[in-house]
């Protein structure tokens, strides 16, 4: 069993199409345990019920944005060790710095390639195969 097959991934994005595209990309990389949520509140509920190893979250979402969700994950003792990647359409340096300060493992600009996503994940977990 590859590392990718063992990692539980949570995708959090308010756009259904984005969640589906990202899920397809992760499946191509060998991930099998993929869950998704439509916003940070729903994502946090999933994380507290069943922690995941990797969270990939959009930045701009209703109810709880990616930064708020990151803060919630990092302050919960049961979820704080999860790797966290934020996706953003905004090329905002302040966002990248804030995300890093709060413990994000990476911030990827949209649109991104599957190779960039793979590199961001491998930076945390090592080679996926």
From Swiss-Prot:
Keywords: Chemotaxis, Cytoplasm, Magnesium, Metal-binding, Phosphoprotein, Two-component regulatory system. One of its GO terms (molecular function) is metal ion binding. This is Probable chemotaxis protein CheY. The modification 4-aspartylphosphate is found at residue 58. It comes from the Bacteria. It is found in: Cytoplasm. It comes from Rhizobium etli (strain ATCC 51251 / DSM 11541 / JCM 21823 / NBRC 15573 / CFN 42). Binds 1 Mg(2+) ion per subunit. Involved in the transmission of sensory signals from the chemoreceptors to the flagellar motors. CheY seems to regulate the clockwise (CW) rotation.
């Amino acid at each position: 069993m590859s590392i990718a097959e063992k990692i539980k991934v949570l995708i959090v994005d308010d756009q259904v199409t984005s969640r589906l595209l990202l899920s397809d990309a992760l499946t191509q990389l060998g991930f099998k345990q993929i869950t998704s949520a439509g916003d940070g509140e729903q994502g946090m509920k999933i994380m507290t019920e069943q922690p995941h190893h990797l969270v990939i979250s959009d930045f701009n979402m209703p109810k709880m944005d990616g930064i708020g969700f990151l803060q919630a994950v990092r302050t919960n003792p049961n979820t704080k060790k999860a790797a966290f990647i934020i996706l953003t359409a905004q090329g905002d340096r302040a966002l990248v710095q804030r995300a890093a300060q709060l413990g994000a493992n990476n911030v990827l600009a949209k649109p991104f390639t599957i190779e960039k996503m793979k590199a961001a994940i491998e930076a945390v977990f090592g080679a996926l195969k």
